[in-house]
Amino acid sequence: MKIGVPKEIKPQEHRIGLTPESVKTLISEGHEVLVENNGGFEAGFENDQYTSVGAKIVDKAEDIFNDADIIVKVKEPQAGEVKMIRENQIVYTYLHLAAAKELTEGLIKSKSVCIAYETVTDNNGRLPLLAPMSAVAGRMSVQAGAHCLEKNQNGRGLLLGGAPGVEGGTVVILGGGVVGENAAVIATGMRAKVHIVDKSEARLKQLVEMFGDKIIPEQSDKIDLNKLVAEADLLIGGVLIPGAEAPKLVTKPMLKLMKRGSVIVDVAIDQGGCVETSKPTTHGDPTFIIDDVVHYCVANMPGGVPRTSTIALNTATLPHLIKIANKGYAKALSDDKHLLAGLNVCKGQVTYKAVADVFGYDYVDPLKTL
């Protein structure tokens, strides 16, 4: 197959769909790879690293979309890219459709085959293609939040890790999944006071086994969330419902309970955010203030560390891409129920129930579209 890797065009997005090492593997399997000129430059991958393993460098994204059987990206197709997607073309990338009605409509009209990294599953019901970026975003969330707490960023003027004789700040993490766990790694390392909120008692026990008394576990149905939000210097939103819009756990009235200059980092913003007042921002303009609370809602946080993120992502996405390229999408999907779970839109039909439900589309069994 002919595999195309366009340069990412979302603002301040510096990752790329494939590393040179991944390209080398695909070419060894007999496939052709087209990479847009300087597509990997910001992630530290030069054109000659791609050509040295057999890739063809293409000057225009249009030519990649015109020629490739499979488009491999990182972020969801932007408006200009959606217009170039062809019927029956395979699009393999993060999509986050439950928070993107216009994109969903565009992909339906394109009659393409859209496989979303974030809904591919594994034998344990986890999301292995989402996990690497969730880990990166979780770790970055505390770094970003700590920076936003500085006075010149309109924060409280508080050093999250404290100082000799001075207590550190309080971090409240909503969600004990991959984002929450990795946020806790950094927050506990900074010696902040860390609360982790999750609905699963079993998951909280796992986190206590990992972190010991460095965290305070909070079961969501047994706490007063208002009180906990009021204590937070830094609130991390890391709640996920696979493929669906994130639940709004923190409402606008709850902001009035928070300290002036406290910070919210809503990692769930890709899926609409778990804070009512959240709206997507960019690395270039990452924050806004509502009711004296700083909101950091960058929708592509891992794009700020593109080299680490690209390598981590490829480790997870490449094995499935090889299956798709070697077998064709229909056989690859029908042979693997976990990859099939990634099929969100196929040839004009919505094949992921959470997306169909949120926008009122008819849900079609993905196997019936192959």
Q: At which residue positions do the language-model features occur?
A:
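Residue-level detector of alpha-helix initiation sites
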Residues: 76, 136, 177-178
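Short glycine-/small-residue-rich Rossmann-like dinucleotide-binding loops
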Residues: 69, 75-76, 95-96, 221, ...
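Glycine/serine-rich phosphate-binding loop and adjoining beta1-alpha1 elements at the start
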Residues: 2, 8, 79-169, 298-300
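Adenosine-phosphate binding glycine-rich loop
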Residues: 118-159, 269, 274-370
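Glycine-rich phosphate/diphosphate-binding loop of Rossmann-like nucleotide-binding domains
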Residues: 6-7, 11-44, 152-240, 287
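Rossmann-like adenosine-cofactor binding region
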Residues: 209-291
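An N-terminal-biased, well-structured beta-alpha scaffold segment characteristic
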Residues: 2-106, 110
